[in-house]
UniProtKB/Swiss-Prot annotation:
It comes from Plasmodium berghei (strain Anka). Residues 180-279 are annotated as: cNMP-binding domain 2. It is found in: Cytoplasm; Endoplasmic reticulum membrane. This is cGMP-dependent protein kinase. The gene is PKG. Keywords: ATP-binding, cGMP, cGMP-binding, Cytoplasm, Endoplasmic reticulum, Kinase, Magnesium, Membrane, Metal-binding, Nucleotide-binding, Serine/threonine-protein kinase, Transferase. PANTHER family: CAMP-DEPENDENT PROTEIN KINASE CATALYTIC SUBUNIT PRKX, CYCLIC NUCLEOTIDE-DEPENDENT PROTEIN KINASE. The keyword Endoplasmic reticulum applies. Serine/threonine protein kinase which acts as a downstream effector of the second messenger cGMP. Controls the release of Ca(2+) from intracellular stores by regulating phosphoinositide biosynthesis. Ca(2+) signals are essential for merozoite and sporozoite invasion and egress from host hepatocytes and erythrocytes, and, in the mosquito vector, for gametocyte activation, and ookinete and sporozoite motility. During the host liver stage, regulates the initial invasion of host hepatocytes by sporozoites by regulating sporozoite motility and microneme exocytosis. Residues 62-177 are annotated as: cNMP-binding domain 1. Residues 545-802 form the Protein kinase domain.
Amino acid sequence: MDDDEIIPKKNHPSNERNKKKAILSHEDFTGEDSLMENHLELRDKLTEDIVTIKASLKNNLVCSTLNENEILALSNYMQFFVFKSGDMVIKQGEKGSYFFIINSGKFDVYVNDKKVKTLTKGSSFGEAALIHNTQRSATIKAGTNGTLWGVQRSTFRATLKQLSNRNFNENRSFIDSVSVFDMLTEAQKNMITNACVIQNFKPGETIVKQGDYGDVLYILKDGKATVYINDEEIRVLEKGSYFGERALLYDEPRSATIIAKEVTSCASICRKLLNVVLGNLQVVLFRNIMTEALQQSEIFKQISPDQLNDLADTAIVRDYPANYNILHKDKIKSVKYIIVLEGKVELFLDDESIGILTRGKSFGDQYVLNQKQKFKHTLKSLEVCKIALITESCLADCLGNNNIDASIDYNNKKSIIKKMYIFRYLTDKQCNLLIEAFKTTRYEEGDYIIQEGEVGSRFYIIKAGEVEIVKNNKRLRTLGKNDYFGERALIYDEPRTASVISTVNNLECWYVDKSVFLQIIEGPMLAHLEERIKMQDTKVEMSELLTERIIGRGTFGIVKLVLHEPTKIRYALKCVSKKSIIELNQQNNIKLEREITAENDHPFIIRLVRTFKDSKYFYFLTELVTGGELYDAIRKLGLLSRSQAQFYLGSIILAIEYLHERSIVYRDLKPENILLDKQGYVKLIDFGCAKKIHGRSYTLVGTPHYMAPEVILGKGYGCTVDIWAFGVCLYEFICGPLPFGNDQEDQLEIFRDILTGQLTFPDYVTDTDSINLIKRLLCRLPQGRIGCSINGFKDIKENSFFADFDWDRLAGRLLEPPLISKSETYAEDIDVKQIEQEEEDNANTEIDDENWDIDF
C-alpha cells in the first residue's frame, strides 16, 4: 500500500502517545550522595529495627519477589541517618539515589513547594531511586528531629546481583548432581536451573507422601529431611540430597514419605514447567543421545543440523528384554543404523562377538553409505535396553532420498553459498532451485576457467582440484576444494578482474549461469542485493562526503544525509558528540555499539559501512534508509490488520533472532528504533543499548514501557527481554495503546504496572490468535514465555497467529509491505545551516582525552 492511499485514523489511541526515550546504563554521583554523607551515623541494628526494615522492604515494588533470606540480606545493608527538624532529605527535580524507611520522627512531603502529607515511623519513600536515577517527584524535609534507615541504589542492586548469582550457581551445582540430567546440554541445564522454585518446609511438615502421585523433583538446599517407607524410618537426607527424579519421567506413585526434620529449604522442579521450558524430559534425553551419536558418525556429521534433528525425531525407539536378538543378519530388511539409548548390547559378525555397545554408542555407517548392501551383523541385548532404529524410510524422509552421497553433496553446496552475502538470505525454495541448477564441468591443467577482461556470466565452486588466480600475469593466490569465484557475474555485466587457471588435471567445478540465477532471484530482492553489494564495494573517506540535510537528532548528536561525491552514493552519517558521551559516562557503551554494529550483516538490520573519528566526534557511516520510522507508519495505518501485524512482527523476529544467535541482546526494541526502507521492509537501528551477553546481565537499560519484568527486578536477565518486547509491539500494533503504563509518565508507576498490572484487551480486538500470542509473549516469568524454551524462536514462528504466514517469502522480499512511502521520509528534516551553530559550540568545547577511544 502506498502512503498517499492512507487516511490516518485520527481518533485511534495509537496516534496519541509521544515517542518514548530509553534509559541509559550509567551511574552518577548525585548531590544526594554528598548530602547523605553529612547525616550518616554508625549504629547496630536492633531486633525491632530488622522487623521494621523487613516489613517495609516486603511492601517495596522491587523487593516483592524476594524470599526471606534475600530480604534479610538487604536489611543488613541499610545505613542509619540522623536529621534535625527542617533538614532537607530529598529535593524535587534532583536525581535520586537513596531509598529510605522512617525509623523515628515525622517527615513532611512537598510538591511544588506545597505540603501534601506527613510520613511517620514505618513509612518509606524514594522507591524509584532503587530502580533508576530518575528525578525526585517531591521534596521531603524533617518535620521533627528524626532518623531514617536508607540504602543507596548501587549498593542495593549490587546486593541483588550477588544474591541472584549465588542462588543460581548453587542451584546449578545441585542440578549437575542429579544423575537424570547427566545427558543434558549446558544450555538445557541452565534452563532447568532458571525454572527452579524455592519451597520452604517447617519441622514435621510432609514434603512428599508415599503412595501419592507426584510430578516434582526436590533438591535439599538447607536443612534435613527424614525418609520413611511404610512408616519405618529409613535414613536422613541432608543438603545436596535429592528425591522424586522419577516423577519428572513417569506418572507413578511416590515410593516413600519424606518429612522435614527441621526448617528445610528445597529447590523444586515440576514436570509441567519442565515440559514448557524443555519439553518432555525423556524425549529430550533420548534426542540428545541420538544427536550426539549421529554427530560422531563419519557419515552423518556431514549432513545439516536440521537433517540431524529430523533423523533424531523420526528414529524408531523400541524397548527390548535381556538376551534378545534385536537384529539378526538373516532377518534384517530396512534397518540401516542403530543407537543405544539405555542398556548394553553385543555386536556379532559371522557369529563372532566384535564388541559391546553401551549408552550413546552407535553402529551402521557402512549400511547407510551403501544401502543396497545386505546386513551381515547381529545385535543381541545383554540386559534390558532401549534402542533407536534408523530405517531406509527415515533416511528418505529426512534427506529427501536414500542417496547419502547426494545429500552430502547438496549440503556442501548449501554451506558454501550460505557464506556469501549474495546467497545468504535466499528462501529455502530459492536455495533449492539454485542448487538444483548447478551443473558440473571439468578442466585440465592450464585451462582457463575465467579470462581477465572478459564479461562473465558464470559463478563457480571448486568440487575437486586447485586453481590459481592471476592478474596482469601476476599470480595472486591459490583456491582449492569448496572455494568459489565469479559470483559478481551473476548480478553485474562487468569485465572479469582476474584470470582463473586450472593447476591440475581433471579439475572439477560446479557452476551456475546468470540467466538461471535471474530466473530464481528477481524483483525487490535483486534490487536489494545490487544496492548492498555496491555500497560495500565503495571505499569512502570522510573528506569525500558532502552534507545535504540533517535527518535525525538524538541524545548524543545528529544524523546527516551525506553524498559520496566520487560515486554519488548517498549515506547516513551519525555524528556522536564525545562531550556528551563523557558527560553521561557512555565510553564503554559507544565502543560496544561500534563493535556490534560492525559485525551485523542482516537485511533487516542497518548496515554499517565504516566509522570515523576526530577530536570532537565519532562518526557512523551507514546505509541510507528513506522510508521513515515504523512509529509513524503504524499511525498512518491505524489499527493493523492481522497480515500487517504479521509482516512487521515477523520482520522484527528475524532481525532479533539473528542477534540472539550471536548472543547479542538488543534491550530497546520499540517502533521508534525501526526504520522502513524504500521497499517498505524494516531496518533495526540504534544499538546503543545492545550488549554481547554471556551468562546474565543486571543493568537497567531500555525504554520503560517496553521493559521486561526481569530487567526491573534486578535479579538478572538474558535475551528473553527482547521477546517480552515482541509482545508489547504486537499489542501496540493491533490494540493501539501500550499494554502497561500507557497513560503514565512516572517511571515508578510504569514499572508497577509492568510488574503487577492486569493485561486487558479492548473490545474491538477479537482475533483470539493475536490475543493468545500476546498473552504468551507477555508472560512475567521468563521461563514460561513463548520463545524462551529450548525450542527458541521456532515456537513463535509456528504459533497459530503465524499459521497462514510465509516466512520464506518474507525473507525473500516477496511479500507486499503494508506501507511503501512514495517520497523520502525522515525523523527530522532540517537545513544544514540551522545546526551549524550547535556544531560550532561543540567544537569549541575542550575534551579531556585519555585515549579511551584509541580503538574506535
